């Protein structure tokens, strides 16, 4: 598998590794056959770092965005111009990580399920980033947790099909998957599907069209089932692909090639 160099990881956060560790992580990814990694920002600082990392590593691409967890912050006027400039960088191939998250944040203690102001702030920030993505013809890398009933209507209202995109770490149901696919969005799967209780996701993977699938690790988060460490990394995308191939009962090499094409088509890359 390592010799093919066709594996792709649509969603990681390389800025979360110390610099020396990140370099080791990228070397292991290359050795495992990973051709492309997209590192996503969550705010202005991490988006700038994503662009910096991508500019310094030929196998890394950048995605810039405002994560729903920070969407309620008051951003000064100059912030928007700085963000727009990052989105225009040559190594920037997508807008993300953007979206909606109505699940209470255990890290910050912020509750969303009963806080209408925070939910509206997320929706407003999301709509603004969809508009920018459409303007710059950049696909969206969408984060969605506990908000699938709101996601599709917003994408439809904002005509997000003009930009297209991928819902990373998809956790919705079959009906929600169909709606997103009908709008031209792809669904990305990662470590979650490796767990024995992920039967609903595995069923969705089995039925959706092959041209609607992408693979991710969300490194350094979302470790795989029975992984030896708590910290995930892009090299593990090889195992995710093998599990998807097993679920779909298809040849692993054929699946890798198909996902590689999906990745290139979404991000407008040359094969």
Residue ranges and their predicted role:
Residues 1-271:
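Mid-domain alpha/beta scaffold segments of enzyme catalytic cores
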């Amino acid at each position: 598998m390592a010799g093919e160099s066709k594996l792709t990881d649509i969603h990681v956060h390389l800025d979360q590794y110390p610099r020396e560790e990140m370099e080791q992580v990228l070397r292991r990814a290359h050795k495992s056959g990973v051709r492309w990694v997209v590192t996503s920002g969550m705010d202005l600082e991490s988006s700038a770092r994503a662009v910096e990392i991508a500019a310094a590593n030929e196998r890394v691409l950048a995605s810039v965005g405002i994560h729903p967890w920070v969407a309620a912050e008051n951003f000064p006027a100059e912030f928007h111009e700085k963000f727009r400039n990052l989105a225009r960088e040559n190594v920037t191939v997508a807008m993300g990580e953007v979206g909606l998250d109505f699940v209470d944040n255990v890290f910050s203690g912020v509750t969303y399920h009963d806080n209408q102001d925070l939910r509206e702030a997320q929706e407003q920030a999301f709509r603004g980033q969809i508009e920018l993505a459409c303007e710059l013809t950049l696909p969206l890398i969408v984060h969605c947790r506990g908000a699938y009933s709101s996601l599709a209507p917003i994408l439809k209202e904002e005509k997000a099909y003009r930009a297209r995109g991928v819902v990373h770490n998809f956790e919705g149901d079959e009906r929600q998957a169909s709606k997103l696919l009908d709008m031209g969005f792809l669904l990305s799967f990662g470590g979650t599907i490796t767990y024995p209780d992920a039967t609903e996701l595995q069923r969705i993977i089995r039925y959706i069209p092959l041209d609607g699938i992408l693979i991710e690790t969300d490194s350094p988060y979302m470790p795989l089932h029975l992984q030896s460490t708590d910290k995930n990394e892009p090299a593990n995308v090889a195992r995710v692909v093998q599990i998807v191939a097993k679920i779909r009962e298809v040849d692993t090499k054929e699946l890798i090639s198909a996902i590689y094409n999906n990745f290139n088509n979404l991000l407008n890359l040359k094969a």
